[in-house]
Curated annotation (Swiss-Prot):
Keyword Cell membrane listed: no
Location of this chain's protein in the cell: Endoplasmic reticulum membrane
UniProt superkingdom: Eukaryota
One GO cellular component, as annotated: endoplasmic reticulum membrane
Family per similarity comment: Belongs to the derlin family.
InterPro entries named among the record's database cross-references: DER1, Rhomboid-like_sf
Record lineage: Eukaryota, Metazoa, Chordata, Craniata, Vertebrata
Membrane topology type: Multi-pass membrane protein
Subunit structure and binding partners: Homotetramer. The four subunits of the tetramer are arranged in a twofold symmetry. Forms homo- and heterooligomers with DERL2 and DERL3; binding to DERL3 is poorer than that between DERL2 and DERL3. Interacts (via SHP-box motif) with VCP. Interacts with AMFR, SELENOS, SEL1L, SELENOK and SYVN1, as well as with SEL1L-SYVN1 and VCP-SELENOS protein complexes; this interaction is weaker than that observed between DERL2 and these complexes. Interacts with NGLY1 and YOD1. Does not bind to EDEM1. Interacts with DNAJB9. Interacts with RNF103. Interacts with HM13.
Annotated gene: DERL1
Protein name: Derlin-1
Residue ranges annotated as Lumenal topological domain: 32-69, 116-122, 167-170
């Protein structure tokens, strides 16, 4: 048990709380401590009965059963893997900026969920984070099952198809990818490549709550230092030297 505790404490803070909630809320529903009916994002209950917790619980809840258990575990792995990589990579030392990214993506997903009657938001939020990581590491070569290798920029779409095969919904993954693209476009692509203004800015109260642990933040519309160094070394193309790809299931 001490090994599990040490591993859990080694997870970066924001990812650790997100991971724990995504385990705890389905467990509470599975044990019947609270009816899962209270966890879904039902527009009528949220908008007219003022059950304001539903957007939060719908983000963490997933109905785990014989037909959905593998899909749940795979996406829980994606949450741990890519949220950890972002929080300790592009957002290293900047927890407020990382939390703001999650909040921005979450708000967009909640609005979309209410408009499209999406009752569960766990997979879209995970996919949005995975998409941002894939774009920041777009030329890294990653390995997937059966020895397939491809650039990271294609990973969100490969996983979209993979989740569909194992019982997921294309809509959930697609919404997550689109929200991740919106964040990446507004924070990086539009200011950097198109010379536009910065539309996203982390609120100051988040910096007061979660101060940066080191100076020289990347800032919105400016690529992280690792991204800039890789671009300089590779002339803007080729395989980035930001770490090794991984095979799904590797530790």
């Amino acid at each position: 048990m001490s090994d599990i505790g040490d591993w859990f404490r080694s997870i970066p803070t924001i990812t650790r709380y997100w991971f724990a909630a995504t385990v705890a809320v389905p467990l509470v529903g599975k044990l019947g401590l609270i009816s899962p009916a209270y966890f879904f994002l039902w527009p009528e209950a949220f908008l007219y009965r003022f059950q304001i917790w539903r957007p939060i619980t719908a983000t963490f809840y997933f109905p785990v059963g014989p037909g959905t258990g593998f899909l749940y575990l795979v996406n829980l792995y994606f949450l741990y893997q890519y949220s950890t990589r972002l929080e300790t990579g592009a957002f290293d030392g900047r927890p407020a900026d990382y939390l703001f990214m999650l909040l921005f993506n979450w708000i967009c997903i909640v609005i979309t969920g209410l408009a499209m009657d999406m009752q569960l938001l766990m997979i879209p939020l995970i996919m949005s984070v995975l998409y941002v990581w894939a774009q920041l590491n777009r030329d890294m070569i990653v390995s997937f099952w059966f020895g397939t290798r491809f650039k990271a920029c294609y990973l969100p779409w490969v996983i979209l198809g993979f989740n569909y095969i194992i019982g997921g919904s294309v809509i959930n993954e697609l919404i997550g990818n689109l929200v991740g693209h919106l964040y990446f476009f507004l924070m990086f692509r539009y200011p950097m490549d198109l010379g536009g203004r910065n539309f996203l800015s982390t609120p100051q109260f988040l910096y007061r709550w979660l101060p940066s642990r080191r100076g020289g933040v990347s800032g919105f519309g400016v690529p992280p230092a690792s991204m800039r160094r890789a671009a300089d070394q590779n002339g803007g193309g080729g395989r980035h030297n930001w770490g090794q790809g991984f095979r799904l299931g590797d530790q």
